[in-house]
Regions:
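Short Gly/Thr/Asp-enriched flexible loops that form oxyanion-binding sites at enzyme active sites
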Residues: 1-3, 46-53, 203-223, 259
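N-terminal small/polar loop signature for handling phosphorylated ligands or for N-terminal nucleophile
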Residues: 1-46, 149-207
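Hydrophobic alpha-helical scaffolding
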Residues: 11-12, 53, 57-61, 94-100, ...
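Flexible loop/turn segments at secondary-structure boundaries
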Residues: 19-21, 42-45, 136-138, 162-165, ...
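Gly/Ser/Thr-enriched, mixed-charge loops and adjacent short helices
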Residues: 47-181, 185-187
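Glycine-rich phosphate-binding loop plus the immediately following alpha-helix
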Residues: 52-82, 223-247, 251-262, 316, ...
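Phosphate-binding and adjacent anionic-ligand microenvironments
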Residues: 188, 192-194, 216-218, 236-337
Length: 337
């Protein structure tokens, strides 16, 4: 309503959506910016303000500093313009969005699938446990897996519904093994192959997978999951002649050196950037502007990655999809991930 009062049209999701879908929506709707209020994987008192620019990536310098400068100039909140919702809607400055964006987002995700036929072959066998940690990933992760044909997705019932207090968790972080307690209990019950957890704003993915030798569920670090997905995507895109010209993988300087080895093995350029996924998103924009290099994948050690360019921020929904496709590929060959 503050935006509307200043003559700026705003699209508002009618209910919860994951952070990467906002990044997608900014681009899809041709917006100049996007705003997301979230605490991400932190406790609710850390609720904060994420800003995305017209390319769908989080703002970098100098825009981030300029935004804070404007905020600090406000000394009296009563001077900030506002208007009623009814007036904003009547003026065409306040518009709800929802299912139409969901559908477009799902279709973009599906473009990243390499072997849909393999998913169908093992759909009756592969068992997946998933928890959204009371957050926004619940509907989109389940939807994309169902639409791709995965038949056995078991959601942790205690953590299925949105809960801003994260009642069942000390810390809703997929890096924390304790956060997987309920998911691992369910995995034992259903004899799951893999366990997935997305953080509350669904931009990071945590994984456990069954060890074929011990039968125990083993945790993956962000480096491990990122490299597994990277190797699968680069290998299978190369094998199916779906690798673009001048392919580029982008990772951060604190991500494992294995990224360089994998990229070199498939003749993919590796670019390393500063810590923070916003710098990976920035690289995609620069490639497009220069007309040189085609982004394929971007992993970071802190459990985030992005396959494709539909969004410009880490995306746990596309990561879940890619991981499950890889798991299906290996299961068909009698292997676990």
């Amino acid at each position: 309503l503050r935006l509307a009062a200043n003559g700026i049209k705003a699209y508002i999701f009618e209910t919860l959506r994951p952070t990467p879908e906002l990044s997608f929506a900014v681009r899809h709707l041709g917006c100049v910016a996007g705003i997301n209020v979230t605490a991400s994987h932190n406790p609710p008192e850390y609720n904060g303000y994420k800003v995305y620019w017209e390319d769908g990536a989080q703002v970098t310098a100098p825009k981030d500093h300029e935004i804070i400068d404007e905020v600090e100039h406000v000394t009296d909140f009563h001077t900030v313009k506002t208007m009623s919702k009814d007036d904003a809607i009547e003026a065409g400055l306040y518009q709800y969005i929802g299912e139409e964006i969901d559908v477009a987002y799902m279709e973009e995700l599906k473009k990243q699938i390499i072997h849909p036929e393999i998913i169908k072959e093992v759909a009756d066998e592969l068992k997946i446990v998933y928890t959204p940690f009371h957050g926004t990933g619940n509907k989109p992760v389940r939807r994309i897996l169902a639409e791709l044909g995965f038949k056995h997705v078991y959601v942790v019932p205690e953590q299925e519904r949105p809960d801003p207090a994260f009642t069942t968790l000390d810390y809703p972080n997929p890096e924390d093994p304790k956060a997987f307690t309920l998911a691992l209990k369910l995995a034992k019950k259903v004899d799951a192959d893999i366990v997935l957890a997305t953080d509350p704003d669904a931009d990071r993915l945590g994984i456990y997978a069954k060890d074929s030798k011990t039968g125990e569920d083993m945790p993956f670090t962000g480096n491990m999951s990122g490299m597994l997905i990277a190797e699968y995507i680069l290998r299978e895109r190369t094998a199916t002649n779906r690798m673009p010209v001048d392919p580029v993988m982008v990772s951060t300087i604190v991500t494992t050196n294995m990224a360089a080895a994998i990229a070199a093995d498939y003749n993919v350029e590796l670019r390393e950037v500063l810590t923070g996924f916003k710098y990976i998103g920035e690289q995609i924009k620069w490639m497009e502007q220069a007309g040189k290099g085609h982004y394929v994948f971007g992993p970071e050690e802190s459990y985030g990655c992005l396959a494709g360019t539909h969004a410009r921020d880490k995306d746990a929904i596309v990561a879940s999809m890619a991981l499950c496709e890889a798991a299906a590929y290996y299961k068909l060959r009698g292997k676990t991930i």
